Regions:
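Conserved SAM-binding loop
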Residues: 1-35, 50-53, 121-125
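Short, solvent-exposed loop/helix junctions and linker helices
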Residues: 3, 46, 113-114
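Structured helix-beta-strand junction loops
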Residues: 19-20, 58-59, 117
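Gly/Ser/Thr-rich beta-alpha loop segments that engage phosphate groups in nucleotides
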Residues: 22, 44, 118
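Short glycine/proline- and charge-enriched loop/turn segments
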Residues: 31-38, 82-86
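Acceptor-substrate binding/catalytic loop of class I
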Residues: 36-54, 67-68
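A SAM-dependent methyltransferase catalytic signature shared across enzymes that methylate proteins
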Residues: 53-68, 125
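A C-terminal cap/extension of S-adenosyl-L-methionine-dependent methyltransferases
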Residues: 67-127
Length: 127
């Protein structure tokens, strides 16, 4: 989430959508795991489903929202509250991309996309 004025940006995006169009947002999830690393890479905040959908522009209707990277969320929580590593090493990123993300792709549907390190929201502009 690299946008300081998130509500205004969603309004601008909604204004560009044609009737029947979709707006898809992928954002970091759960403010409770916001870390110095988030800040270092330009994240202003993290969202849960309720918080992200609260930003719904008046011209759009929520269509779907779900979480991704369930295993990543658990590891981020461990890092945030136990290890307290401020930024990942290149080796950590390599393990994450090659192991954690593929395993999360298997785990996410099993947990119903109910939690994860990222959240996806989809809005539709009515016809």
């Amino acid at each position: 989430e690299h946008i300081e004025d998130d509500r205004a940006e969603l309004e601008r995006a909604a204004a560009r959508l044609a009737p029947g169009g979709h707006l898809i947002v992928l954002s970091p999830a759960y403010q409770s795991v916001y870390s110095p690393f988030d800040k270092a890479i330009g994240h202003f905040r993290r969202y849960d489903r309720k918080g992200l959908l609260a930003l719904t522009p008046p011209s759009l209707r929520p269509a779907r929202s779900f979480y991704l990277d369930s295993l990543g969320l658990m590891l981020s929580a461990v890092n945030r509250f136990v290890a307290r590593q401020s930024s990942p090493t290149p080796a950590t990123i390599k393990v994450w991309d090659r192991t954690i993300v593929p395993l999360s792709r298997i785990a996410d549907p099993l947990v119903g996309h109910a939690f994860g390190r990222s959240i996806v929201a989809v809005w539709t502009r009515p016809v």
